[in-house]
UniProtKB/Swiss-Prot annotation:
This is Probable NAD(P)H-dependent D-xylose reductase xyl1. InterPro entries: AKR (IPR020471), AKR2D (IPR044487), Aldo/ket_reductase_CS (IPR018170), NADP_OxRdtase_dom (IPR023210), NADP_OxRdtase_dom_sf (IPR036812). The lineage of its organism: Eukaryota, Fungi, Dikarya, Ascomycota, Pezizomycotina. NAD(+) binds at residues 166-167, 215-224, 271-281. The gene is xyl1. SUPFAM superfamilies: NAD(P)-linked oxidoreductase. It comes from Aspergillus fumigatus (strain ATCC MYA-4609 / CBS 101355 / FGSC A1100 / Af293). It comes from the Eukaryota.
């Protein structure tokens, strides 16, 4: 099964549905990637901070070696972590991440957060997380402009075909677009019916920046992180609005939530290690929700953000 794609402003096509690597266990990651490729997934969304890029690369290599897929048919995404925002740190860490994946280039390399932290030597701790080598929250003075200029050089050197940002507000995008020589191809944000961010999505798309949603199932991704809001918020899978629409279309609640995004040209990156759910999550483009159903789902908005750096105890 293949999915439609979004034409990026860089000229490349990005699949509308991909497989996210956040919280994918290192022990099972290689197999999960391999089986996802067999199921038809072509976009894989990784990051330094996820700590599983070596294993993900092994899954990709196995699929390529067995002739299931060619490298050029895959769309591999990774992210620049906060500790490497200084201009002279961007290229070295990108090269390390490429080596971890066993790749020559990333299809898309993203600034993970608009937060610059003090450099942590990968030889000391990797992934570095939020704390410095002194186990304190320490910031770098690197500006977004300094970081973005270094990101642009990755495209010049063919280490990344496209570059993008994540967790940026509209105001930060406005600032970035004033000086960007290479415009961000994508914006990845937390996006689900409890956090619709409609104005941000509209602005980004108007500027020709493709939007990718993470945590499409809302609190589900954050319950195991023991976040109070996630525990106290009704699960979207159990919400009467979502369940009713799913029943009407003969789909699962997960498929409805994903289609709510993809029908508005927002890419999604769910994950699963269940073969049935893998196939179901990929089947979220060949059928449509009614306009009234999209509106009903969007009306569930609470402006409730789960992935909030200010919620981290050390901040």
């Amino acid at each position: 099964m293949t999915t439609p794609s979004i034409k990026l402003n860089s000229g490349y096509d990005m699949p509308l549905v991909g497989f996210g690597l956040w919280k994918v266990n290192k022990e099972t990651c290689a197999d999960q990637i391999y089986h996802a490729i067999k199921a038809g997934y072509r976009l894989f969304d990784g990051a330094c901070d996820y700590g599983n890029e070596v294993e993900a690369g092994k899954g990709v290599a196995r699929a390529i070696q067995e002739g299931i897929v060619k490298r050029e048919e895959l769309f591999i995404v990774s992210k620049l972590w906060n500790s490497f925002h200084d201009g002279d740190r961007v290229e070295p860490i990108c090269r390390k991440q490429l080596a971890d994946w066993g790749l020559d280039y990333f299809d898309l390399f993203i600034v993970h957060f608009p937060i610059a932290l003090k450099y942590v030597d990968p030889a000391v701790r990797y992934p570095p997380g939020w704390l410095s080598e002194n186990n304190k929250l320490e910031f770098s003075n690197a500006s977004i402009q300094e970081t973005w200029t270094a990101m642009e050089s990755l495209v010049d050197k063919k280490l990344a075909r496209s570059i993008g940002v994540s967790n940026f507000s509209a105001q930060l995008l406005m600032d970035l677009l004033r000086y960007a020589r290479i415009r961000p191809a994508t914006l990845q944000i937390e996006h689900h019916p409890y956090l619709t961010q409609e104005r941000l999505v509209t602005y980004a798309q108007k500027e020709g920046i493709a939007v990718t949603a993470y945590s499409s199932f809302g609190p589900l991704s954050f319950v195991e992180l023991d976040l109070k809001d996630a525990h106290e918020t009704p699960k979207l899978f159990d919400h009467d609005v979502i369940k009713g629409i799913a029943q009407k279309h003969g789909r699962t609640p997960a498929q409805v939530l994903l289609r709510w995004a993809t029908q508005r040209n927002i890419a999604v990156i769910p994950k699963s290690n269940d073969p049935t759910r893998l196939a179901q999550n990929l089947d979220v483009t060949g059928w449509d929700l009614e306009a009234s159903e999209i509106e009903a789902i969007s009306a569930l908005n609470r402006n409730l953000r789960f992935n909030d750096p200010l919620a981290i105890p050390v901040v």
